[in-house]
């Protein structure tokens, strides 16, 4: 569909974002986890979702591998496909924020421009960039999926950190040391959410 198609009209919802947030008892927001493969993005995001669920917070976790089984199953790993992957995820995340959810996304999302694109789509105050800062050597030593080994052997092309660039955030809302205990990282994130009045419990 062309963006300029005049036959496609936006319909406003009778229930507002603010009403949905009041119903949930917290604000809608995206926590955008970014970092190298093996940095701990999915692990920390999953642990945070579990902690938030126990607090009664309405959440949803969008994982990089999972969306490629459905929503983005037609995309590869070229720069163009990666950009489209992030665009689609950003649109879904934005819809979930408008539903009043705390959305956690775990994607390498290697380019600053794509992360900024999602930030602008979601809106300031509703986008929290979480940089899981783990050295490449540590990520490669972990190699939970065996992808670094394949990349080093030339069996996997365009792999971020090896033969494809990762642009680290320059001004993320929070930088997490990926070598710390997951429980410590989750606590840092809960503190941030409370400080920003996103959750109250």
Swiss-Prot record:
<feature type="active site" description="Phosphoserine intermediate">
    <location>
        <position position="109"/>
    </location>
</feature>
<keyword id="KW-0597">Phosphoprotein</keyword>
<comment type="function">
    <text>Catalyzes the synthesis of activated sulfate.</text>
</comment>
<protein>
    <recommendedName>
        <fullName>Adenylyl-sulfate kinase</fullName>
        <ecNumber>2.7.1.25</ecNumber>
    </recommendedName>
</protein>
<dbReference type="Pfam" id="PF01583">
    <property type="entry name" value="APS_kinase"/>
</dbReference>
<comment type="pathway">
    <text>Sulfur metabolism; hydrogen sulfide biosynthesis; sulfite from sulfate: step 2/3.</text>
</comment>
<feature type="binding site">
    <location>
        <begin position="35"/>
        <end position="42"/>
    </location>
    <ligand>
        <name>ATP</name>
    </ligand>
</feature>
<keyword id="KW-0547">Nucleotide-binding</keyword>
<dbReference type="GO" id="GO:0004020">
    <property type="term" value="F:adenylylsulfate kinase activity"/>
</dbReference>
<dbReference type="GO" id="GO:0005524">
    <property type="term" value="F:ATP binding"/>
</dbReference>
<keyword id="KW-0418">Kinase</keyword>
<keyword id="KW-0808">Transferase</keyword>
<comment type="similarity">
    <text>Belongs to the APS kinase family.</text>
</comment>
<dbReference type="GO" id="GO:0000103">
    <property type="term" value="P:sulfate assimilation"/>
</dbReference>
<dbReference type="GO" id="GO:0070814">
    <property type="term" value="P:hydrogen sulfide biosynthetic process"/>
</dbReference>
<dbReference type="InterPro" id="IPR002891">
    <property type="entry name" value="APS_kinase"/>
</dbReference>
<keyword id="KW-0067">ATP-binding</keyword>
<dbReference type="InterPro" id="IPR027417">
    <property type="entry name" value="P-loop_NTPase"/>
</dbReference>
């Amino acid at each position: 569909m062309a963006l300029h198609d005049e036959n496609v009209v936006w319909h406003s919802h009778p229930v507002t974002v603010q009403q949905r947030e009041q119903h949930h008892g917290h604000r809608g927001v995206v926590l955008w986890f970014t970092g190298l493969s093996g940095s701990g993005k999915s692990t920390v995001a999953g642990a945070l979702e579990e902690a938030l669920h126990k607090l009664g917070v309405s959440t949803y976790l969008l994982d990089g591998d999972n969306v490629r089984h459905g929503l983005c199953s037609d995309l590869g790993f070229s720069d163009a496909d990666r950009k489209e992957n992030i665009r689609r995820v950003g649109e879904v995340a934005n819809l979930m924020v408008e539903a009043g959810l705390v959305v956690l996304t775990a994607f390498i999302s290697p380019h600053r421009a794509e992360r900024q694109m999602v930030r602008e789509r979601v809106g300031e105050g509703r986008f929290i960039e979480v940089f899981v800062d783990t050295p490449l050597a540590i990520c490669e030593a972990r190699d939970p999926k065996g992808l670094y080994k394949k990349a080093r052997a030339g069996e996997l092309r365009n792999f971020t950190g090896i033969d494809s660039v990762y642009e680290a955030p320059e001004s993320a809302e929070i930088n997490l040391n990926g070598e710390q205990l997951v429980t410590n990282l989750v606590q840092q994130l809960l503190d941030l959410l409370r400080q920003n009045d996103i959750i109250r419990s």
